[in-house]
Amino acid sequence: EISCSLVGSEMCIRDRYNVAEIIFGGNINMSRVYNFSAGPSMLPEEVLKKAASEMLDYEGSGQSVMEMSHRSKVYDNIIKTAERLLRELMNIPDNYKVLFLQGGASTQFAAIPLNFMNGSNKADYVITGQWAKKAFAEAQKYGDAKAVASSADKTFSYIPKLDKSMFRSDADYVYICMNNTIYGTVYHEIPDTGDIPLIADISSCFLSEPIDVTKFAMLYGGAQKNVAPAGLTICIIREDMLGNARDITPTMLNYKIHADANSLYNTPPCYTIYICKLVLEWIEKLGGLEKMKERNEKKAKLLYDFLDNSKMFRGTVVPEDRSLMNVPFVTDSDELNAKFIEEATKNGLVNLKGHRTVGGMRASIYNAMPYDGVEKLVNFMSDFEKANS
């Protein structure tokens, strides 16, 4: 029996009680829900337990990762291990820099044109949802940003067909959002942009399946969906793209500065990078990105098959462009949608409400969502349909 509390007890710290025992053991009755949030999202339970066990004393250092200096030897090993694992899992070539930054994916909307719209002062954008739309609007502040294709005409329910002839030959880069979190669409094929550098926001499909990094000049994403808690943004940039930022580029938005400093120009989000390392170790243990893709396809198929055969629920995306990560769906009634969300929450299926701009429902089934969670959702949807038909 644990006789002292976790908070405010020097004895607990000095005696080095196992935090995992305090949190997960004893008489504490845990009740974990299935969290379908688009982000921040579920983390693997194995990762949470590992982090809990190391909370007070990381590998005999006598301190939490939250407390240690980002320039200490022990933390240097954490961030270097995270980068090594990411490079191995994604097969990132040596001529690409990996940056662990702050500011979220949204900050990159400005950083990208400031760093890369530096030749013709032109950039081509494909608008497939709110995040691509926001990135495009930001780029327009800095140069000749052009929307070369859009799926806004059908509420972003599909990915436009692209041909390299659509892109301006002198554009400094082409920009896409690989997976559209709100609308549930994804590029199943990487666009052919010829010699024009391709940049992609992969926030909501990061590490969900293999991707050919060499097809891109830059990949980036917020970590709070598939990689870690909120607070970390990972950028993967081909080295030849660096070093030509505009003179007006703020220091903290200059990728070359962060690359030269190995992501330590200022204090990084240390604990979030540590959790990222644990998640990468978890993915490696499962068998890498090919195995992760198999897991994700199995989960998505279960949910899409139900939607395709339901008389009450229907998906909102054309089948050929469906995302493995984000599955939006609706009924024919706003009242029924609201009732479904309320009852699902009571049954431990939380954060199924669709984005405020589109309504309905959305199940985000990222890497950490187990098959059992999707199965429970589908069973609940089936029961709900029978009870409300």
What are the residue ranges of the model-derived segments?
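Single conserved hydrophobic/aromatic residue that forms the stacking wall/gate
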Residues: 1-15
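PLP-dependent enzyme catalytic core of the Aspartate aminotransferase-like
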Residues: 27-33, 346, 359-389
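A glycine-/small-polar-enriched, mobile loop at the entrance of the PLP active site in fold-type I
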Residues: 32-83
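Active-site phosphate-binding strand-loop segment of PLP-dependent enzymes
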Residues: 39, 139, 150-206
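Conserved N-terminal alpha-helix of the aminotransferase class I/II PLP-enzyme fold
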Residues: 62-108, 115, 130, 138
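PLP-dependent aminotransferase-like
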Residues: 106-174
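Active-site C-terminal subdomain of aminotransferase-like
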Residues: 223-304, 318, 387-389
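Conserved PLP-binding catalytic core of the aspartate aminotransferase-like
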Residues: 313-344
